[in-house]
Amino acid sequence: MDMVSLKFIGTGLMAIGMYGAALGVSNIFSSLLSSIARNPSATENLQRMALIGAGLTEAMGLFSFVIAMLLIFS
């Protein structure tokens, strides 16, 4: 295989990181809704923690995207 095809295979594999981020964010918010339904008085604290967790999880997907773009255009 030449380097160009290996770059595109690596870029395709980076999609796994973006898929993982999407699953992580959906899991965080489904757990948030479930937790708020059980204990509405803890809504403010739960929302803060969920947004921090979602931001960190989404950062993984963005890093994966940046690495994929670096692989394609380098």
Curated annotation (Swiss-Prot):
Topology with respect to the bilayer: Multi-pass membrane protein
Feature type site, description Reversibly protonated during proton transport: 58
PROSITE patterns according to UniProt: ATPASE_C (PS00605)
SUPFAM superfamilies per record: F1F0 ATP synthase subunit C
Gene Ontology molecular function terms on file: lipid binding; proton-transporting ATP synthase activity, rotational mechanism
InterPro entries: ATP_synth_F0_csu, ATP_synth_F0_csu_DDCD_BS, ATP_synth_F0_csu_sf, ATPase_proteolipid_c-like_dom, F/V-ATP_Csub_sf
Key words, A-Z: ATP synthesis, Cell membrane, CF(0), Hydrogen ion transport, Ion transport, Lipid-binding, Membrane, Transmembrane, Transmembrane helix, Transport
Identification of the protein by name: ATP synthase subunit c
Organism, as annotated: Rickettsia africae (strain ESF-5)
